[in-house]
Amino acid sequence: MAKAKFERTKPHVNIGTIGHIDHGKTTLTAAITKVLHDAYPDINEASAFDQIDKAPEERQRGITISIAHVEYQTEARHYAHVDCPGHADYIKNMITGAAQMDGAILVVAATDGPMPQTKEHVLLARQVGVPYIVVALNKADMVDDEEILELVELEVRELLSEYEFPGDDVPVVKVSALKALEGDKEWGNSVLELMKAVDEAIPEPERDVDKPFLMPIEDVFTITGRGTVVTGRIERGVLKVNETVDIIGIKTEKTTTTVTGIEMFRKLLDEGQAGENVGLLLRGIKREDVERGQVIIKPGSVTPHTEFEAQAYILSKDEGGRHTPFFNNYRPQFYFRTTDVTGVVTLPEGTEMVMPGDNTEMKVELIQPVAMEEGLKFAIREGGRTVGAGQVTKINK
């Protein structure tokens, strides 16, 4: 069966849900698809909770893509929405997921107010450069006292300001995702109001379409009879079918190949552009030739490196960071784009140790090469938990 072509008539914006576990991120995601389907049935499909909760790709391909993607449209825009799992051990996906957002819907239960993971997700949103946040004050149907709602809203605004988001100006919309999902008209309207706020408060992103093509690989799988497909979000540039690309990073040698097909939401494209989540079919490439963490680039536009200088912020104990300082030759993982690479840290002259909560300069030597340029951001992690964040300031080798 031929695939429908993807229509690119409306502005395309990537958003997602973030926030504490059980505050209703996935329920809200499902409610948005239902309410928009009811309002504009010709341009929206409804996605059921369990379909999103289990990430449908997982079941279809027998491989784990651990972030659920749904798409929907308002009158003004086409949205691709990622639902990030809430647990701390999914923070890796929070990092890859949040990196895919032009803006985020921060879900806070009115019954609880901001909780530790709310804080952690806002901090991560700040670190990975999520530029705009809209707040959904969920479960508002369960709070009778207007004053409590106001207090919770104030707390959320203060939290956002603390992490350098414009807390006073961020839209806060009271919703009940569950009631909206159950078909309650009034609470359904609250979800439409939320999406109106998203339309207005999350600007259309400036796309990097004019820069040379680059896409970090998130996943690799084989489609029987067609070959190897890699998926990811195009970070910048434009890629047309039948163009030549290099695959670099992680391995010592680069691989050169031709892209024979580009897909988005199971529809075929002639080209993929910055900001879009796509699958690329690669000619003559085996499943084991490529891996998550590598990047696909316009040939020669970026080079892999192992030694760099960086400015980093080390999380305080209260932010979920280390409880003790680290010293020279500290060996954490550096999380670049979609993968962890171990590196050895050299501290500046005269710095004996770095305390949780400090900013520091550092030199890093990685055990595997990473495609990098100045300004590239990374997280510093230990055993799966984020303990710092930084940016490459200079490449040495």
Swiss-Prot record:
Keywords: Cytoplasm, Elongation factor, GTP-binding, Hydrolase, Magnesium, Metal-binding, Nucleotide-binding, Protein biosynthesis. Residues 176-178 are annotated as: G5. It catalyses: GTP + H2O = GDP + phosphate + H(+). One of its GO terms (biological process) is translational elongation. Coiled coil: none annotated. SUPFAM superfamilies: EF-Tu/eEF-1alpha/eIF2-gamma C-terminal domain, P-loop containing nucleoside triphosphate hydrolases, Translation proteins. GTP binds at residues 19-26, 83-87, 138-141. HAMAP family: EF_Tu_B (MF_00118_B). This is Elongation factor Tu-1.
